[in-house]
Amino acid sequence: MATSASRIAPTTPQSSHSRAWDALTPPLSEWILDAISAMGFSRMTPVQASTIPLFMAHKDVVVEAVTGSGKTLAFLIPVVERLLRLESPIKKHHIGAILISPTRELATQIYNVLLSLLAFHGPSAARLQRTENNSGEVDESNPASSYPPSTLKIVPQLLLGGTTTPTQDLSAFLKQSPNVLVSTPGRLLELLSSPHAHCSQSSFEVLVLDEADRLLDLGFKEDLQKILQRLPKQRRTGLFSASVSEAVDQIIRVGLRNPVKIAVKVKGAGLEDKRTPASLQMTYLLTPPTHKLPAVKYIVSTLSPTPQRSILYFSTCAAVDYYQHILPCILPDRFTTIPLHGKHPPQVRQKNFTRFVNSVTSSILLTTDVAARGLDIPAVDLVIQIDPPTDPKAFLHRCGRAGRAGRRGLSVIFLHPGREEDYIAFLNVRKTPVTEFQSTSTSTPSQLYSSSHFSASSPKNPQTFHPIQITTADATSTTEKIRALVLRDRAIHDKAQRAFVSWLRSYSKHQASSIFRVADLDWEELGRAWGLLRLPTMPELKGFTGDRNLGVSGVDWDNYAYKDRQREKHRRMEMEGRSSSNVNNNGDATGSDKGPLKRPATSESIPWSQNLERKSEKERRRERKKIRRYHEQWKKMTEEEKERVRETEQMVNAVRKAVQEQDQTVTREEEFEGFD
């Protein structure tokens, strides 16, 4: 490992014992050493050894480190130490530290690691325990507590959109008076807009932006700008990411004061800088589209030991929705597939993520780039990228879900033979080199992520490695299995059509457009790879002269039914109505050979007035349903609960009024200029 830092004096190379936790200056508290020991971390990682002393010594830091290098503890420990070394406790409803992450999953992960630390700090653990027991009602004068109210303690609060309402978050904030907030940008901004939440110069200490480059991405800039306007300029700020260098022009504008820039990288066998952990082997596999799923089956089945947790990356949410039905019929029964993407409701995302993290059997997560950044999923052995990422920056983050914290891992990216092979050289230029995925033999399990065969540059027995062999018969058999499954339920056919179209749109928007070209695609090969019964109607196929039915014949589209009875009933009613309409207008019914029945007129093809009336009626029904649910909940409440609701509503109304007045008032204070 090599560490580089700016604006600090050069130091001699650190020996291995200097990465001991008790060798830090200033020293860590005894309870933190106990917590770290209980977590099983015997030594600091290079990023922790470089960052913790500087962040604790009143320095702003910009940290670029390979994924899985321990960045979370590198900022949590300094934050906790700073707050617990204050001269006096932070005032009620005043905030001492804010930790911002781009996703709910990553924010939850940071919060859980923080709770694990605080479990070893007596006053903080006691306060959190009392908060749980009393449902948020904390009595600081409780004589049963062994710690006086003046004792310094950490009280965190997790703020996530979609899981709680802003009203519930504000209510919890007022009851618990947390001094550390872990949040996503949008929900944090809503809380900071309240006049009851204070980030004064006397109390606010630290701001941390995790996955900083993504936080500064489109969609987060405006929220960050407003958040920074509400924070004092005299603060410590830390930015942590695996690829800070690509967003440094924007990061400089965030408001850091003379930051120390820390870059922790990996030295490869040829002493070249790499941006990936040495314990992670990154490989590629050149394979035609029809061979991808057989290759997935081969890899997960032959690796030894069998990967307990694997991640399959797709380019779109629709592809995940489709393949969650397809893969169980392709893979061995011992593997469980779990879908996760950004369009799932928050409760489903959290449920599936927890299910995957806590799985005790071999599990495969089917996901998009929503699970590519920051998530520390324990013991991920294998990452397979079915689709190369649209944004090349995501490649590194996808691979980094495996090989974390020194654990060995394997990453494989699938590329089509031909022009896509140029992506290999493209990755080398970006200091993320990949080697060809190979098997030890055709009869023995691959040992590619075992210690004896791990190094791609110097394998123990290089002559025993061979490219994996997927036959045409394997590909044909897989396509037939998929089509047999699709024919059982028209809903899966619909998902296949949507997924294929969304995949094509994603492919056409690839930033490396000279490598990933729609004009080079083999449509019939792709259709068979996806198990389609026919190619969807798309502008890209306007000049296509091949077989749109992909060799599939004998499908009775009129009687091709949905498994869901209600949905099938609705389809048949639509079909009958359309048939009668065609008979009345044209004297003849539309035959089934014309293709699938068209959907009823959309909002774009009906009169504007009817469309507006339809939307208004939906809104009225939704509002009536909301009021009905509210009255049902109100009837079940006790008088005490009703009183709390009234108080909360009064507070929210007061907040709204104050915010409106604040927006209407023209201030002459210096404004944050934002990101160019």
Swiss-Prot record:
Residues 610-664 form a coiled coil. It is found in: Nucleus, Nucleolus. It comes from the Eukaryota. Residues 566-577, 630-645 have a biased composition (Basic and acidic residues). CDD domains: DEADc_DDX55, SF2_C_DEAD. Transmembrane segments: none annotated. A motif (DEAD box) lies at residues 210-213. It catalyses: ATP + H2O = ADP + phosphate + H(+). One of its GO terms (biological process) is rRNA processing. Residues 1-18, 131-149, 453-465, 578-589, 602-611 have a biased composition (Polar residues). InterPro entries: CTT_SPB4 (IPR056330), DEAD/DEAH_box_helicase_dom (IPR011545), Helicase_ATP-bd (IPR014001), Helicase_C-like (IPR001650), P-loop_NTPase (IPR027417), RNA-helicase_DEAD-box_CS (IPR000629), RNA_helicase_DEAD_Q_motif (IPR014014), SPB4-like_CTE (IPR025313). PANTHER family: RNA HELICASE. Component of pre-60S ribosomal complexes. Belongs to the DEAD box helicase family. DDX55/SPB4 subfamily. This is ATP-dependent rRNA helicase SPB4. It comes from Ajellomyces capsulatus (strain NAm1 / WU24) (Darling's disease fungus).
